[in-house]
């Protein structure tokens, strides 16, 4: 049998095999057998050396025509098989449109994010800029720049997660302030910033403590900034978050990076200052710490403390949310319980 007869026979047999294939697996096997790299057409091409030179052109042309025909028929057969499979599925699989629909569930903002977004908008409206810093910080920026050298006893006030001797999970967002302070160009105006973010401390988790919580620290540096400016700012923050009817007071305190240092209390939400178990019968609840920036902090950042001064404050966003919404357990913030979270949808703005 010469090659022309073999091509004619392959033509007839190939079309017959393609027409018999009823699934994609069988069709792929036919494709490999006919036009694959080791298929029948390839074998014929490899035997071209036995064809007389004057017939090689015609044989090659016949092989190419047959390959094109097989590929076209194979593609058409595959399309028909896919359509048949889909038609069968549509016939067998039905949707019962009489079943009741399932209502889509909309998420809601986390209560801490509600407080965070509200405070960020509030401070931006007062001309502050919002700064985000790294959560893995250096000892230099978290402590040394903040007037806490390595031998300072106040370091024991913060149980810090150290990664190595120089790097740590930040225990406060003060590092953001230090980074901005040392780069700020005061010839272009005062520095007003807030730095929100996660902080970490080696606390045992319970109803009032967490190894991770959200903090926002603020910093204002300019000429002629006074304690009165700080007091007015803190009062505005407290009344904005907790309501205009809240009374406030400042108490002396101690923080290494401010001097003088104060803590702010607001009148108890439960008893309006009359005294109850929530406020430990004092009528007041502590909400934040603040103070006038220590001259050493300014000098560490290359700022002349004889010319510039300012104030700083730190807000625990978890604590603000606990107080504002009457939450009993700080761990509720981190359990991802939808039943707990969805009750704050009405607080979104």
UniProtKB/Swiss-Prot annotation:
Annotated compartments: Cytoplasm
Swiss-Prot/TrEMBL keywords: Aminoacyl-tRNA synthetase, ATP-binding, Cytoplasm, Ligase, Magnesium, Metal-binding, Nucleotide-binding, Protein biosynthesis
Pfam families to which the protein is assigned, alphabetical: Phe_tRNA-synt_N, tRNA-synt_2d
EC numbers, comma separated: 6.1.1.20
Keyword Cell wall biogenesis/degradation attached: no
CC annotations in GO: cytoplasm
Necessary cofactors: Mg(2+)
GO MF annotations, alphabetized: ATP binding; catalytic activity, acting on a protein; magnesium ion binding; phenylalanine-tRNA ligase activity; transferase activity; tRNA binding
Binding site for Mg(2+): 259
SUPFAM superfamilies, per database record: Class II aaRS and biotin synthetases, tRNA-binding arm
GO BP term, example: phenylalanyl-tRNA aminoacylation
Record's cofactor remark: Binds 2 magnesium ions per tetramer.
Reactions mediated catalytically: tRNA(Phe) + L-phenylalanine + ATP = L-phenylalanyl-tRNA(Phe) + AMP + diphosphate + H(+)
HAMAP family, sorted: Phe_tRNA_synth_alpha1
Family classification: Belongs to the class-II aminoacyl-tRNA synthetase family. Phe-tRNA synthetase alpha subunit type 1 subfamily.
NCBIfam families (UniProt xref): pheS
Quaternary structure and partners: Tetramer of two alpha and two beta subunits.
Name by which UniProt lists this protein: Phenylalanine--tRNA ligase alpha subunit
Organism encoding this protein: Lactobacillus acidophilus (strain ATCC 700396 / NCK56 / N2 / NCFM)
Organism classification: Bacteria, Bacillati, Bacillota, Bacilli, Lactobacillales
